């Protein structure tokens, strides 16, 4: 949902989510080739792949509302002011496992250094990212797998705290909601 004056993954949309008193605001992160984490839904900005670009190459990119592309640091700083809002941080899938692994380490360290572990929940379509999150957080964070290809028992066995599957997955496996609850998983 876009509110007037905001754009997907913008600081304005984060503030508007808090004003609306919703549970949380979901946002997407990508890491540049030089290790800077930016908040952006797509893997590209124009024709430039974020994971292959340096931050310098993309830092002046504008969102639809005119805001400059936010870094994760800036987004977390804004989110920290909004104490009643959960930050639902989606780490985007990358074809390169090493890039995913480094992104997880960088992101978890930043969240921890800012003291925002309780305000931040992680989601990803990448099984590797979720597995790395369990290792990096010691299982102390909310980690939701969203790809839809694991049963609740499999997700629980990997240390995830929840599943956040498309409704079509639950249409195919209606028993999974009850199974997830029996396993102690959260379902979104």
Segment roles from a protein language model:
Residues 1-188:
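Phosphate-group recognition and catalysis centered on beta-loop-alpha active-site segments
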């Amino acid at each position: 949902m876009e509110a007037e004056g905001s754009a997907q993954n913008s600081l304005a949309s984060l503030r508007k989510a808090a004003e609306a008193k919703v549970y949380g605001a979901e946002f997407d992160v990508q890491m540049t080739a030089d290790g800077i984490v930016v908040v952006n839904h797509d893997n590209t900005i124009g024709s430039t792949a974020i994971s292959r670009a340096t931050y310098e190459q993309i830092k002046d990119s504008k969102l639809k509302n005119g805001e400059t592309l936010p870094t994760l640091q800036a987004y977390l700083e804004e989110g920290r002011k909004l104490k009643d809002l959960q930050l639902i941080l989606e780490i985007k899938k990358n074809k390169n496992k090493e890039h995913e692994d480094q992104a997880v380490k960088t992101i978890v360290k930043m969240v921890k250094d800012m003291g925002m572990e309780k305000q931040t929940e992680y989601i990803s379509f990448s099984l590797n990212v979720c597995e790395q999150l369990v290792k990096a957080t010691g299982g102390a964070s909310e980690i939701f797998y969203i790809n839809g290809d694991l049963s609740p028992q499999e997700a629980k066995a990997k240390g995830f705290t929840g599943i956040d599957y498309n409704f079509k997955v639950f249409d195919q496996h209606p028993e999974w909601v009850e199974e997830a609850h029996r396993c102690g998983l959260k379902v979104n």
